[in-house]
A protein has these predicted regions:
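Hinge/lid segment of periplasmic solute-binding proteins
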Residues: 77-138, 193, 282-286
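Extracytoplasmic/periplasmic substrate-binding proteins
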Residues: 189-192, 196-199, 227-319, 325
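Short helix-initiation/N-cap motifs at beta->coil->alpha
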Residues: 47-56, 160-162, 241-255
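Short amphipathic alpha-helical coupling segments at ligand-binding clamshell hinges
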Residues: 26, 30, 221-228, 314-327, ...
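Glycine-centered hinge/linker elements that transmit conformational signals in sensory
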Residues: 167-168, 208-243
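Long, aromatic- and glycine/proline-rich binding clefts that accommodate carbohydrate-like moieties
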Residues: 286-288, 338-405, 436-459
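Short, solvent-exposed loop/beta-turn-alpha elements that line the ligand-binding surface or hinge
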Residues: 93-114, 200-224, 274-277, 287-298, ...
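Conserved N-terminal structural module of periplasmic/extracytoplasmic solute-binding proteins
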Residues: 1-85, 103-109, 155, 331, ...
Length: 459
């Protein structure tokens, strides 16, 4: 068999996470397998620093050299929609439009209809799937079940009231424990808790029915969450490490026995369970507790998705689309990686494959993330908010919570100031889009220091 004289190159840009650079390796291997299956193509995977990713894509777009496929983090959905090519047209096209109703592309079965429902909903705008989920996570509760049962609690708490009761029982049982529960002061958890209550962070249905013009840190749902959080801390039940985005610090507090419960990303299920085993206790993984007074409206996701460049010639476009389907076929979409961190599989077929192989029987702690997402109703709340300057805006809320917990600032007054700061950041982004173009690489969104230090994969 002769090699084609000139191969069609498909450039793929993925995020490089400073502490976990090996996460790109499985995708490179899958791209190499795609190249063997389709010798007329050469898929090239490049890793770009996560903090610089949107800016680098914007600069490449301005130069006319943007990648054919770009993996945007969920915090940059608005930027991905706003970026333009040198002629001022949107850089990306929807995957739905590009697929055009086909059932397979270059022999690769199209998997759009098999994507887990709320993942598909999260990346759907105006009825079209804008981008393909690449990895997905949610937020879960990790419980030292040995400590809970010793305190007379048979099962992990599922509501805020049950968390309070569990913390009180733990405090009465073991006065040496620093607190009953811990979690990082991070924007994604604010967003989850607001969504669980059916609340919104922005107008126009969280930016889903139109561009967000107003952010809301003063909603009843937000104030209910941060008030409950503050009160847990005041009662000595919540352990704050004193640092924002301190995922590792909270995980260590849980592993060391300083807290009997931990709220954290589903990506960390493997490391958390292994750390607990090493420490000599059992972990039970369950859904993220919700506000029983508001009822349960669902949880949202985080992660990355693959965006397809518009205006490609047909062979390049179809090669890129075929690669997207290949990366999400049942085997590749299982997303079980050697480094021990696990994303939620992106398709129902991949979940079924793992189940048929007995993987969940051997690793039951990975199942709650799937169960939580499957029971989450589709709504503007659970689709999550979309707005520009996402990272600085969420950082404003994190700083406000820090000031409430550490300095005892008045909660309502402090979050009112944070709301004003967040609104200013949103207005700055809107002015930037209006006065320039989103492809100049000089937009106002910058990764705050707390974000630069984080090493979350899906969060």
């Amino acid at each position: 068999m002769h090699e084609p004289a000139e191969k069609i190159t498909i450039n793929v840009w993925l995020n490089r996470w400073p502490m976990w650079q090996q996460l790109v390796d499985p995708i490179r291997k899958q791209a190499a397998e795609f190249n063997r299956r389709h010798p007329q193509y050469r898929a090239v995977v490049e890793a770009v620093n996560v903090g610089a990713f949107p800016r680098e894509v914007a600069r490449a777009a301005r130069a006319g050299t943007a990648p054919h496929i770009a993996a945007y983090q969920y915090t940059y959905l608005q930027e991905a929609q706003d970026i333009r090519d040198p002629d001022g047209r949107p850089l990306f096209t929807s995957v739905t439009k590009a697929v055009g109703g086909r059932e397979e592309i270059l022999g690769e079965p199209v998997v759009l209809d098999d994507i887990v429902a709320n993942m598909r909903a999260y990346y759907t705008f105006d009825g079209d799937l804008s981008s393909m989920p690449r990895n997905t996570s949610t937020v879960l509760l990790y419980s030292n079940i040995d400590a809970l049962r010793a305190a007379g609690i048979a099962e992990p708490p599922s509501t805020w009231a049950e968390v309070e009761a569990a913390c009180a029982a733990l405090a009465g049982r073991d006065g040496a424990r620093r607190a009953g529960i811990t979690w990082p002061n991070f924007g994604w958890l604010f967003q989850q808790s607001v969504a669980q209550q059916g609340g919104l962070l922005a107008d126009h249905e969280n930016g889903r029915s139109g561009r967000s013009e107003k952010v809301d840190f003063m909603s009843p749902e937000m104030l209910a969450y941060v008030t409950w959080w503050r009160d847990l801390h005041r009662a000595g039940h919540y352990l704050y490490t004193g640092k924002q985005s301190d995922w590792w610090g909270c995980m260590e507090a849980f592993a060391n026995g300083d807290a009997a419960m931990l709220v954290s990303s589903s990506v960390e299920t493997g490391p958390i369970v292994r750390a607990a085993r090493k420490a000599g206790f059992r972990v039970q993984v369950s859904r993220m507790p919700y506000n029983e007074r508001a009822g349960y409206a669902g949880n949202l996701i985080a992660g990355e998705s693959l965006w397809l460049r518009d205006g490609l010639d047909e062979p390049t476009r179809d090669g890129a689309l075929a690669l997207m389907q290949f990366l999400n076929n049942p085997r590749n979409a299982t997303s079980i990686y050697d480094h021990g961190r696990t994303f939620v599989p992106t398709t129902e077929a991949s979940i079924d494959l793992l189940a048929s192989e007995g993987w969940f029987d051997q690793n039951p702690h990975y199942r709650p993330a799937i169960d939580q997402l499957r029971i989450s109703p589709d709504s503007p709340a659970t689709r999550g908010a979309v707005f520009g300057n996402f990272l600085p805006i969420q950082s404003a809320g994190m700083q406000a919570m820090h000031d409430v917990l550490v300095d005892g600032e008045d909660l309502a007054a402090r979050f009112s100031r944070a709301n004003a700061q967040a609104q200013q950041l949103l207005d700055e982004y809107a002015q930037h889009v209006e006065s320039a173009t989103a492809n100049d690489g000089q937009g106002p969104q910058k990764m705050p220091q707390a974000e630069a230090e984080r090493i979350r994969l899906g969060a």
